[in-house]
């Protein structure tokens, strides 16, 4: 499995290259239709997730530990966590979701993340789990209130 890290090249090979014949023949409407249909889910959301993972390094002073690795996690049953960071010395596990969608993120996303975090086997019997949620359109007041009550949740817009 390989991944092109340059977002412009990703865009080119995902949208331009497969549609060259339409573009060259002047059928821009077909290309634009495909772009509108797939641009957010098949390009922007992945770019946003990568930006969120990079942002974790900038948020290092938010948590009372320093993590060693930042990446993502998935298992054989297609469960996925957008952001995962570990602190091997202290047994801290940071998990996060990145939501690039219309509307605010609610408690349901946090609950789903909490369930997925329990599936992670890393240091399972001796760890502290921290949560971070990223959203381009904010959070519900219910989730903001819960985050204010708990020190293990960080919300970022």
Annotated model-derived regions:
Residues 1-80:
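Accessory nucleic acid-recognition modules appended to NTPase machines
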Residues 125-157:
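Domain-level recognition of nuclease-like catalytic cores that cleave nucleotide substrates
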Residues 70-75, 96-108:
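Acidic/glycine-enriched edge-of-secondary-structure segments
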Residues 111-125:
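Short, basic/hydrophobic alpha-helical segments
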Residues 56, 81-85, 89-102, 113-115, ...:
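Conserved catalytic cores of phosphodiester-cleaving nucleases, focusing on short active-site segments
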Residues 102-114, 141-143:
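Active-site-adjacent loop/helix micro-motif of nuclease/hydrolase catalytic cores
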Residues 9, 100-103, 137-140:
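Conserved nucleotide-binding/hydrolysis micro-motifs of P-loop NTPases
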Residues 21-23, 64-65, 80-82, 91-95, ...:
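Extended hydrophobic-aromatic, low-complexity segments
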């Amino acid at each position: 499995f390989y991944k092109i890290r340059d977002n412009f090249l990703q865009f080119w090979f995902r949208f331009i290259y497969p549609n060259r014949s339409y573009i060259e023949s002047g059928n821009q409407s077909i290309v634009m239709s495909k772009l509108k249909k797939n641009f957010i889910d098949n390009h922007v959301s992945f770019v946003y997730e990568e930006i969120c993972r990079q942002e974790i390094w900038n948020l290092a002073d938010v948590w009372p530990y320093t993590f060693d690795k930042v990446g993502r996690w998935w298992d054989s049953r297609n469960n996925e966590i957008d952001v995962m960071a570990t602190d091997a010395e202290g047994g801290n596990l940071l998990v996060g979701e990145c939501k690039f969608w219309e509307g605010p993120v609610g408690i349901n996303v946090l609950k789903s993340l909490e369930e997925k975090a329990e599936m992670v086997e890393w240091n399972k019997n001796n760890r502290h789990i921290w949560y971070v949620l990223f959203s381009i359109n904010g959070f519900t007041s219910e989730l903001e209130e819960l985050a204010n009550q708990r020190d293990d949740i960080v919300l970022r817009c």
